[in-house]
Design a protein with these regions (language model features):
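Cysteine protease catalytic domains with a Cys-His-Asp triad
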Residues: 1-91, 96-103
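Residue-level detector of alpha-helical secondary structure
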Residues: 5, 12-21, 127, 191-195, ...
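Surface-exposed polar/charged interaction patches
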Residues: 24, 59-63, 129-132, 176, ...
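Charged/polar, solvent-exposed surface patches and flexible loops
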Residues: 55, 59, 120-128, 213
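Cysteine protease-like catalytic core of ubiquitin/ubiquitin-like
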Residues: 64-174
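C-terminal folded domains that constitute the principal catalytic or ligand-binding module
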Residues: 138-220
Length: 221
């Protein structure tokens, strides 16, 4: 399978961070973005190192009433084919709904595939900083018995395109502020519709070119 280049990991991190800041296109959201790191909430679930949350995100989870957008990173683990330790990044949206916060987690896999306790551990960490219960809504799994794995056509020798996917979902959210007016149930329906449409586009050619072309065009490369 041929892949388009440059790969996101071949682009300077500061350029990826700059694009993330550039996509802050709606004042309906609060953007808890670390100016020095692509990831704002970092979970080191593989070796048990304590999580690291950007100070601006910790403050926003507790005090900001607007929906908060940030990027979450976590460990996938060692990959023998790539001879590398793989990490993953996910665009995340925290919304106060009732007496709790729902974090809409625009991932592409079931977190139980990483670890049975991973989701509950992340929820506990976010809740600690928010001061209220936090529930993680895995966007890949809202409307199907089997989660939608949007990276299934990337091939065994590729990693890092999650950098592009995080920007894709960020642009979707900032370009669709009406999403925030929906009920929690209707938010899930809108997410399921988005994932289904993207999944169909991926499935027709059975390639990873959708996100590759998106990222390269977005970055002007």
């Amino acid at each position: 399978m041929q892949h388009l280049r440059p790969h996101p990991t071949e682009v300077a991190e500061k350029k990826n961070i700059a694009k993330k800041f550039e996509l802050r296109r709606s004042d309906a959201f609060h953007y808890a973005f670390n100016p020095h790191d692509y990831v704002d909430a970092d979970f080191f679930n593989y070796n048990g190192t304590p999580p690291k949350l950007y100070a601006g995100l910790r403050y926003a989870l507790r005090y900001v009433q607007k929906p908060v957008i940030f990027f979450t990173g976590y460990d996938v683990g060692p990959n023998d084919i790539l001879n590398a330790f793989v990490r993953h990044v996910v665009c995340s949206l925290a919304v106060r709904e009732g007496d709790h916060i729902n974090i809409y987690f625009f991932d592409m896999r079931n977190l139980r595939d990483i670890s049975p306790s991973m989701q509950s551990s992340m929820e506990a960490e976010f809740s600690k900083h928010a001061g209220v219960p936090v529930h993680l809504v895995n966007s890949a799994c809202v409307d199907r018995s089997k989660c939608v794995y949007l990276q299934r056509f990337k091939g065994d020798t590729e990693f890092g395109w999650c950098i592009g996917w995080a920007l894709f979902f960020l642009e979707y959210l900032t370009g669709t502020p009406s999403f925030l007016q929906k009920s929690p149930l209707d938010k899930k329906k809108a997410i399921a519709d988005l994932y289904t449409k993207v999944d169909r586009r991926l499935s027709e050619p059975r390639s990873n070119h959708f996100i590759e072309a998106y990222y390269i065009h977005l970055m002007g490369l």
